Amino acid sequence: MKKLSAEQIQQNWNTLIDVINAHIGDDRRDNLLKMYDDFQDRMMFAPASAKGHFHNAMPGGYVEHVLHIVSHSLEIKQMWEKNGAEINFTDEELVFAALHHDLGKVGDLEHDYYIPQDSDWHRKNRDEIYKHNPSLQYMKVPDRALWLLQHYGVKVTDKEYIGIKLTDGMYDEANKAYLMSYNPDFGLRSNMPHILHQADMMSTYIESDEWKRGSETEEPMNTKVPKTKDEQKQIDNLKSKFDELFN
C-alpha cells in the first residue's frame, strides 16, 4: 500500500498553498486562504477515498489527489486547445474548480468526512481503511464543497460552479440533466467540465495503479531536506502529530 511520509505531506501542503497564491486572484484569495488555514490540520491528513483499492486512501491522500488534478487539468486543457477545442474559460477558473471539486471530502465545520474504520472485518474483507462519519449531515461531495465556499464568502463563477458539480461525470446520476440534454439550448456552454472529468479519471487510475504496485511506491519520493531550523521544527511537529494519529 502506498504511504506518504510526514515530509511529503508537509511538502504537498506547501505546494497547495503556492498554487492558490499563484492562480487565484486578489479578490477572493484572502477568504480562500482563511478557509485553508481553518482546515489545515484536518485537510493535510485527509484521505481521498475510503478503500485501499480505490485511490489515495491514506493520510495525505486528499491533498495529493487535488494536486494531481490541478496538474492534469492544465495539461489536458493544452491538448484540447492545441487540437482546436474552444477554450472560453480562464486558467484561474480551471484551477479553482480542480482545487475544490472534492472539497466536500474534508467534512463540515465540525466533523471529518472520513474516520478510521474500527471494524476489523470490514478492514480485512472489504479493504475499508476509512468509513463515512455518521455524525456528518449528508450532502453530496460537490454540494458540500460549494456550501463551504459560500460559508467563507468565496465567490464562484458559473463555469466554476458547473465544473465542480460535474467533475464526476456520469458516475453521478445527478449529472445526467447536464450531460445528456437533447435540447441544444440546455447543453454545456464550456468544455471545462469535460476537461476536469478527464483529469479526475486520469488521476484516479494512476493513483490506483500506484496502489497495485504496492512496495514499489513505499519509499518516500521527492522529499526535500529542510533548509532552516524553523522548517525542521515544522517537520518534527508534523511527524509527532502523524505518529499520534496513525501509529
Residue spans for each PLM region:
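Generic detector of well-ordered alpha-helical segments enriched in charged/polar residues
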Residues: 10-21, 29-37, 161, 165, ...
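Divalent metal-dependent catalytic cores for phosphoryl transfer on phosphate-bearing substrates
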Residues: 55-58, 64, 76, 87-211
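Acidic, carboxylate-rich catalytic segments that either coordinate divalent cations
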Residues: 181-247
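Acidic/His-rich, divalent-metal-binding segments that scaffold phosphate/diphosphate chemistry
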Residues: 1-124
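Residue-level signal for secondary-structure boundary elements
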Residues: 24-28, 44, 172, 207-210, ...
